[in-house]
Amino acid sequence: MSVREVYQKIEPRMKKTIEAFQHEIASIRTGKATTALLDRVKVEAYGQQMPLKQVGNISVLDVHTLIVQIWDKSMVSATERAIRDANLGLNPAADGQNIRVSIPPLTEERRKEFVKLTKKFGEDSKVSLRNLRRDMIQEIEKLEKSKAISEDDKNKGKKDADEMLHKFEKQLTELIVHKEKEIMEV
């Protein structure tokens, strides 16, 4: 194994960390209606917990309203209850086979809570990135100990690991700042 192979093994894992962070913050309310708000909602359907996406179609009606079109009419009340119980501060209202979900404006206090949550998710992701960098450096050091690479290659590999970490941390910081602006926008 070479330093390049170690790099190629770790880089996709760092990308996945960024993608996971993006998915995580997509469900944080910003005051605007997005279908991602309901991604984590689970509905008690047919004797099991199912993601909301599997019992109906979610779409944005306007800036402050989502519409959930339920495929099975018997699931309307369970879906409405699941949205209400998801602790998202949303108020669903059944309308035939559809559920209208009004997105109330966020209070200043709630916005600050969401910013804090975004920063927490960001810090957790940064820790994951640093752990991946550590793993990369450990693998490079093992290669050097087994004489598979030279000391110069080891040092270059460590430098590459630091640069890769810096690149992904910068990307993460930009995502955090963007989400904070989105949340604080009134």
From Swiss-Prot:
<dbReference type="GO" id="GO:0043023">
    <property type="term" value="F:ribosomal large subunit binding"/>
</dbReference>
<dbReference type="InterPro" id="IPR002661">
    <property type="entry name" value="Ribosome_recyc_fac"/>
</dbReference>
<dbReference type="GO" id="GO:0006415">
    <property type="term" value="P:translational termination"/>
</dbReference>
<keyword id="KW-0963">Cytoplasm</keyword>
<comment type="function">
    <text>Responsible for the release of ribosomes from messenger RNA at the termination of protein biosynthesis. May increase the efficiency of translation by recycling ribosomes from one round of translation to another.</text>
</comment>
<dbReference type="InterPro" id="IPR023584">
    <property type="entry name" value="Ribosome_recyc_fac_dom"/>
</dbReference>
<comment type="similarity">
    <text>Belongs to the RRF family.</text>
</comment>
<protein>
    <recommendedName>
        <fullName>Ribosome-recycling factor</fullName>
    </recommendedName>
</protein>
<dbReference type="Pfam" id="PF01765">
    <property type="entry name" value="RRF"/>
</dbReference>
<dbReference type="GO" id="GO:0005737">
    <property type="term" value="C:cytoplasm"/>
</dbReference>
<dbReference type="InterPro" id="IPR036191">
    <property type="entry name" value="RRF_sf"/>
</dbReference>
<keyword id="KW-0648">Protein biosynthesis</keyword>
